[in-house]
């Protein structure tokens, strides 16, 4: 927990401390999984928390994996109620859904562009995509063979699907609905991913509706529902919703 010095651009030292301060006798551990069911089981057997996301897996698929995880915890002698499943979601909220969509569109398309495997899956589901004759596996798609306008159309399709199904996007009302949906499948925390290319000032302004979602969905939970509490957690660890 002691400060560690790192050099600034000009070479002068800058002391960095971890936040929040380590006060627990034991440090909690999270296993990160992209969706492999066996990883969920291993995390349960090891008595670790889980961090996952919706890139390449649906909410329904995550629900099944959470059940596998809780079962593995119990079979290994752990109390399942003491362990957390944290779901990371790309996040941006605004006063109306259209504004949120347009602010997030290009940054999310750039983010998705870097995930070749995911783009191949979306291309496979894109109605206008002409699958090469004899190809049965989307991972066999050669993205380099796509014309620029074809790739752009697939990215637009991928973004709209992701915006609607796999993130914390839209209005406060949209986000509350999504969080309640996640609570119903036994998700303990939502980690709001906000630094994926949206300008900093816009991101910070967008924390205000996120704080309102926090207030509405954590009512009575004892969590810090103030903006100060939200800002602290965003700078430190994933926020609970």
Where in this protein do the model-derived segments appear?
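An alpha-helical appendage that flanks or caps ligand/catalytic pockets
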Residues: 1-19, 60-184, 220-240
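A local structural motif
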Residues: 22-28
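Hydrophobic faces of well-ordered beta-strands that scaffold small-molecule active sites
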Residues: 29-32, 50-53, 83-90, 190-192
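A conserved active-site cap/scaffold subdomain adjacent to cofactor or substrate pockets
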Residues: 35-59, 65-66
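Structural motif
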Residues: 46, 185-187
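Glycine- and acidic
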Residues: 48-52, 160-165, 191-197
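Glycine-rich, proline-tolerant flexible connector loops at the mouths of alpha/beta enzymes
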Residues: 54-59, 192-204
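C-terminal helical cap(s) of enzyme catalytic domains, especially alpha/beta-barrels
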Residues: 62-70, 199-220
